[in-house]
């Protein structure tokens, strides 16, 4: 169980796979499996049988979780994928800082 470096609602860029280069938002984080669910990335088609909730059934497109190593945090200040460092502020709070521009994320 690896520590996941992104949080829910973070902006990330996909760095490998069929959606490489796509900038999107993290919808969910699964730390036990080290996976993240990214909006409009890794979209799969699922064949759904008709049931009470979905009378029609059919083919549904939805996002599937991807490994957290395939995404990188996106800094909106320098408009690029970046690594992060942790910094301790004077009031004692820990913040994440962009390695490229030094902006607090």
Curated annotation (Swiss-Prot):
Q: One biological-process term from Gene Ontology? A: translation
Carries keyword Ribonucleoprotein? Answer: yes
The UniProt GO MF terms for this protein read: rRNA binding; structural constituent of ribosome
**A single cellular component GO annotation:** ribosome
Q: Which domain of life is it from?
A: Bacteria
Entries under InterPro entries matching the protein? KOW (IPR005824), Rib_uL2_dom2 (IPR014722), Ribosomal_uL24 (IPR003256), Ribosomal_uL24_KOW (IPR041988), Translation_prot_SH3-like_sf (IPR008991)
Per UniProt, the keywords (alphabetical) are: Ribonucleoprotein, Ribosomal protein, RNA-binding, rRNA-binding
What Pfam families does the record point to?
KOW, ribosomal_L24
Assembly notes: Part of the 50S ribosomal subunit.
* Similarity field: Belongs to the universal ribosomal protein uL24 family.
The role this protein plays is: One of two assembly initiator proteins, it binds directly to the 5'-end of the 23S rRNA, where it nucleates assembly of the 50S subunit. One of the proteins that surrounds the polypeptide exit tunnel on the outside of the subunit.
Q: Which HAMAP family match?
A: Ribosomal_uL24_B
**What is this protein identified as?**
Large ribosomal subunit protein uL24
């Amino acid at each position: 169980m690896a520590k996941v470096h992104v949080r829910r609602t973070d902006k990330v860029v996909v760095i490998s796979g069929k959606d490489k280069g796509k900038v999107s938002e993290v919808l969910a984080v699964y730390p036990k499996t080290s996976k993240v669910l990214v909006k409009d990335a890794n979209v799969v088609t699922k064949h759904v049988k008709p049931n009470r909730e979905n009378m029609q059934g059919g083919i549904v497109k939805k996002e599937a979780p991807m490994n957290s190593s395939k995404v990188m945090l996106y800094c909106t200040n320098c408009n690029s994928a970046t690594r992060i460092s942790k910094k301790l502020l004077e009031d004692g709070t820990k913040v994440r800082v962009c390695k490229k521009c030094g902006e607090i994320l």
